[in-house]
């Protein structure tokens, strides 16, 4: 159940909401399947499909935002609209105008929507009240923005801010590579992206490739900066840090898997054990990563 991505946030004031209070607030914006004429619906769903919108273990909270979207390709709508427009032109003797075409397209969309397939996407949120972390499991900023918007809507007021650090990820990652020295507790892995600041945006990528410090220094001397860097924290968690301070490709390593609680009797107990371990490890990793980036900068 480990998160694969971390869009990291902090609280500008101590977290004060209980799980029951969060549950009650989310319930006002709970997910319900859309009608046949709705293109998209969105709301909070149970992370464990047990009716509870907040899953809590040891004070750690897990939320799930569910999005249901109809798959209605624009090409299909345009194709049917053009066919209808041709019929209208034949009947009235001239092509439909812009306003008529717009109305026709809306009519076609309404007719096709009930027959469109629906897909659901769940985006998870982890809240660590004690250490002040909130992370969204989303690789794309746009998806994280959706979640943030729904959080602010449900938990108003919510003292949520982006994590700010004293040294930019680009400057720090470039410095680590130039000096061939990762910060304490971290190692550099075999995935790197270096990008030029020039208009050409010339880019060099290493993927599962041995790193030559001299080659890296030459690229850096030529003006390229590190925008993506794979790292491992304490031989326990691997990840990729991006220039936007998004943590991607998060994965527990074997040492954590070996420490997993083998006494769990059922799926629910295993899930809770995994969630507890994930929260503990990622909280420690985020704290160390923040320090490696010069510490937290208060907004």
Curated annotation (Swiss-Prot):
Q: Which organism is it from?
A: Cupriavidus necator (strain ATCC 17699 / DSM 428 / KCTC 22496 / NCIMB 10442 / H16 / Stanier 337)
**Function comment:** May be involved in recombination.
* Segments forming a coiled coil: none
Q: Which Pfam families has this protein been placed in?
A: RdgC
Protein name, as recorded: Recombination-associated protein RdgC
Cross-referenced PANTHER family: RECOMBINATION-ASSOCIATED PROTEIN RDGC (PTHR38103:SF1)
GO molecular function ontology, one term from the record: double-stranded DNA binding
Can you tell me which family this protein belongs to?
A: Belongs to the RdgC family.
Does the record's keyword annotation contain Cytoplasm?
A: yes
Q: Where is the signal peptide?
A: none
Q: Where in the cell is it found?
A: Cytoplasm, Nucleoid
Recorded hits in InterPro entries, A to Z, give: RdgC
The UniProt entry, under HAMAP family, shows: RdgC (MF_00194)
Q: Output the GO biological process annotations, alphabetical, semicolon-separated.
A: DNA recombination; regulation of DNA recombination
Question: What keywords would UniProt list here?
Answer: Cytoplasm, DNA recombination
Name a single GO cellular component.
cytoplasm
Q: Which gene carries the instructions for this protein?
A: rdgC
- Main localization of the protein? cytoplasm
